[in-house]
Amino acid sequence: MEQFLKIGLIINTHGLKGELKVNPQTDNIDRFKKLKRVYIAGEEKQVEGCKFLNDKVVLKIQGIDGIEIANKYRNKYIEVKREDAVELPEGRYYVADIIGCKVLDEDGNYLGKVKEVIHTKNNDVYWVEGKKELLIPVLKTIVVKIDIENEEIIIKPVKTWLLE
């Protein structure tokens, strides 16, 4: 399991004092208000402030005091240690734990591994790479079981839900 979890991507600077504009990658952006420390490019950083700008988060990080310094962090991820992450309710999973899971159907056929989780308005979609690439909607009618410990996801047979 990943030791660090990505919670946002730094997309730009904000203002002249070194604030960072972050595209959140979490279900609940309010969690950013509680952050005391984060990791950027593997370095621990102290969070001095947080505000929201539409659907983005603006963070003030200790030691990043100007636009020139802030620019160096563009396109880097904001991460937290797993033990500092928000506890998820039952049936919810961190994207980092889903990526790399083997996907099999109920008949035991290996379909591939989850390469990416795509977030859509209605539901997530697993992008599975195997003999064929599959986009699997994360719906209770399709995804039967998610076993993070064994890195395995069981789905209904593709022919039952995908029209070819």
Swiss-Prot record:
GO terms for molecular function: ribosome binding. Its main location: cytoplasm. The keyword rRNA processing applies. Keywords: Chaperone, Cytoplasm, Ribosome biogenesis, rRNA processing. This is Ribosome maturation factor RimM. It comes from the Bacteria. It comes from Clostridium tetani (strain Massachusetts / E88). Residues 90-161 form the PRC barrel domain. Binds ribosomal protein uS19. Belongs to the RimM family.
